Amino acid sequence: MRLLIDTNVLSEASKPAPERRVLEWLHELDEDRVFISAVSIAEIRRGVALMEPGRRRDALASWLSDDLQQRFDQRVIPVDTAVAFAWGDLMASAKRMGRGLASMDGLIGATATTHNLVLATRNTKDFKGLGIELLDPWAD
Protein backbone atom coordinates (compact mmCIF):
# COMPACT_ATOMS: atom_id res chain seq x y z
CA MET A 1 0.00 0.00 0.00
CA ARG A 2 1.30 3.44 -0.96
CA LEU A 3 0.41 6.25 1.43
CA LEU A 4 0.08 10.02 1.44
CA ILE A 5 0.65 11.28 4.98
CA ASP A 6 -1.65 14.17 5.90
CA THR A 7 -0.39 17.22 7.75
CA ASN A 8 -2.05 16.20 11.02
CA VAL A 9 -0.10 12.93 11.07
CA LEU A 10 3.19 14.71 10.36
CA SER A 11 2.43 17.29 13.03
CA GLU A 12 1.68 14.59 15.59
CA ALA A 13 5.25 13.33 15.25
CA SER A 14 6.63 16.78 16.11
CA LYS A 15 4.57 17.29 19.27
CA PRO A 16 6.27 17.28 22.69
CA ALA A 17 3.97 14.42 23.78
CA PRO A 18 2.84 12.62 20.62
CA GLU A 19 0.31 9.82 20.58
CA ARG A 20 2.37 6.67 21.06
CA ARG A 21 0.22 4.60 18.73
CA VAL A 22 0.79 7.05 15.86
CA LEU A 23 4.56 7.15 16.42
CA GLU A 24 4.73 3.36 16.40
CA TRP A 25 2.64 3.27 13.24
CA LEU A 26 4.96 5.80 11.55
CA HIS A 27 8.09 3.85 12.52
CA GLU A 28 6.69 0.64 11.02
CA LEU A 29 6.08 2.17 7.58
CA ASP A 30 8.06 1.22 4.49
CA GLU A 31 9.59 4.64 3.76
CA ASP A 32 9.75 4.00 0.01
CA ARG A 33 5.96 3.72 -0.14
CA VAL A 34 5.18 6.87 1.85
CA PHE A 35 4.75 10.35 0.37
CA ILE A 36 3.83 13.83 1.55
CA SER A 37 2.25 16.74 -0.28
CA ALA A 38 4.00 20.07 -0.78
CA VAL A 39 0.77 21.44 0.71
CA SER A 40 1.67 19.84 4.06
CA ILE A 41 5.02 21.59 3.99
CA ALA A 42 3.20 24.88 3.38
CA GLU A 43 0.75 24.24 6.23
CA ILE A 44 3.50 23.37 8.68
CA ARG A 45 5.61 26.34 7.56
CA ARG A 46 2.66 28.67 8.14
CA GLY A 47 2.26 27.27 11.65
CA VAL A 48 5.94 27.76 12.42
CA ALA A 49 5.93 31.29 11.00
CA LEU A 50 2.99 32.21 13.25
CA MET A 51 4.75 31.03 16.42
CA GLU A 52 6.43 33.43 18.80
CA PRO A 53 10.25 33.35 18.57
CA GLY A 54 11.80 30.80 20.89
CA ARG A 55 13.23 27.31 21.23
CA ARG A 56 10.06 25.50 20.17
CA ARG A 57 9.78 27.58 17.01
CA ASP A 58 13.47 27.06 16.23
CA ALA A 59 13.17 23.31 16.80
CA LEU A 60 10.12 23.03 14.53
CA ALA A 61 11.73 25.17 11.84
CA SER A 62 14.77 22.90 11.92
CA TRP A 63 12.59 19.77 11.86
CA LEU A 64 10.75 21.10 8.82
CA SER A 65 13.72 22.36 6.81
CA ASP A 66 16.19 19.63 7.73
CA ASP A 67 14.63 16.43 9.06
CA LEU A 68 11.31 16.31 7.22
CA GLN A 69 12.64 17.39 3.83
CA GLN A 70 15.62 15.05 4.10
CA ARG A 71 13.45 12.12 5.17
CA PHE A 72 11.03 12.56 2.27
CA ASP A 73 13.61 13.90 -0.21
CA GLN A 74 12.20 12.65 -3.55
CA ARG A 75 8.78 11.81 -2.10
CA VAL A 76 7.28 15.31 -1.79
CA ILE A 77 4.47 15.57 -4.35
CA PRO A 78 3.91 19.03 -5.85
CA VAL A 79 0.59 20.52 -6.89
CA ASP A 80 0.55 20.21 -10.67
CA THR A 81 -2.12 20.51 -13.36
CA ALA A 82 -3.46 16.98 -12.75
CA VAL A 83 -3.84 17.68 -9.03
CA ALA A 84 -5.47 21.04 -9.83
CA PHE A 85 -8.10 19.35 -12.03
CA ALA A 86 -8.75 16.70 -9.37
CA TRP A 87 -9.04 19.45 -6.73
CA GLY A 88 -11.71 21.25 -8.75
CA ASP A 89 -13.75 18.05 -9.09
CA LEU A 90 -13.27 17.13 -5.43
CA MET A 91 -14.33 20.56 -4.16
CA ALA A 92 -17.39 20.52 -6.43
CA SER A 93 -18.36 17.06 -5.14
CA ALA A 94 -18.03 18.21 -1.53
CA LYS A 95 -20.16 21.27 -2.24
CA ARG A 96 -22.85 19.16 -3.94
CA MET A 97 -22.88 16.97 -0.81
CA GLY A 98 -23.45 20.10 1.28
CA ARG A 99 -20.07 19.82 2.94
CA GLY A 100 -17.37 22.38 3.36
CA LEU A 101 -13.86 21.20 2.64
CA ALA A 102 -10.90 23.47 3.35
CA SER A 103 -8.90 24.28 0.23
CA MET A 104 -5.67 22.84 1.65
CA ASP A 105 -7.44 19.62 2.64
CA GLY A 106 -8.93 19.47 -0.84
CA LEU A 107 -5.47 19.78 -2.41
CA ILE A 108 -4.13 16.99 -0.22
CA GLY A 109 -7.13 14.79 -1.07
CA ALA A 110 -6.71 15.57 -4.77
CA THR A 111 -3.03 14.63 -4.53
CA ALA A 112 -3.98 11.27 -3.03
CA THR A 113 -6.52 10.47 -5.75
CA THR A 114 -4.32 11.70 -8.60
CA HIS A 115 -1.41 9.52 -7.49
CA ASN A 116 -3.50 6.52 -6.35
CA LEU A 117 -2.40 6.85 -2.75
CA VAL A 118 -4.20 5.96 0.47
CA LEU A 119 -4.60 9.11 2.56
CA ALA A 120 -3.43 8.62 6.16
CA THR A 121 -5.29 11.23 8.21
CA ARG A 122 -7.03 11.76 11.49
CA ASN A 123 -9.76 13.74 9.71
CA THR A 124 -11.41 10.88 7.86
CA LYS A 125 -14.86 12.46 8.23
CA ASP A 126 -13.73 15.40 6.08
CA PHE A 127 -13.05 13.07 3.15
CA LYS A 128 -15.78 10.41 3.56
CA GLY A 129 -17.79 9.79 0.42
CA LEU A 130 -15.39 11.68 -1.84
CA GLY A 131 -13.75 8.64 -3.42
CA ILE A 132 -10.53 8.82 -1.42
CA GLU A 133 -9.19 5.67 0.21
CA LEU A 134 -8.56 6.53 3.87
CA LEU A 135 -6.59 5.22 6.82
CA ASP A 136 -6.69 6.65 10.35
CA PRO A 137 -3.43 5.95 12.26
CA TRP A 138 -5.20 6.82 15.51
CA ALA A 139 -7.83 4.14 14.96
CA ASP A 140 -6.39 1.51 12.61
Language model feature labels by segment:
Residues 31-33, 73, 116, 131:
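A generic structural signal for alpha->beta connector loops
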Residues 1-40, 49-66, 125, 140:
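Short, well-structured N-terminal submotif of metal-dependent ribonuclease cores
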Residues 42, 83-85, 140:
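A short acidic, often aromatic-flanked loop/helix-cap motif at beta-alpha or helix-coil junctions
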Residues 8, 21, 82, 106-107, ...:
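Active-site phosphate/pyrophosphate-handling residues
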Residues 46-54, 70-119:
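Active-site neighborhoods of divalent-metal-dependent phosphate/nucleic-acid chemistry enzymes
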Residues 1, 107-140:
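Acidic, PIN/NYN-like endoribonuclease modules and their adjacent C-terminal/linker elements
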Residues 21, 43, 86, 129-130:
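Phosphate- and divalent-cation-binding pockets in alpha/beta enzyme and binding domains
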Residues 35, 77, 135:
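General small-molecule cofactor/ligand-binding pocket signal
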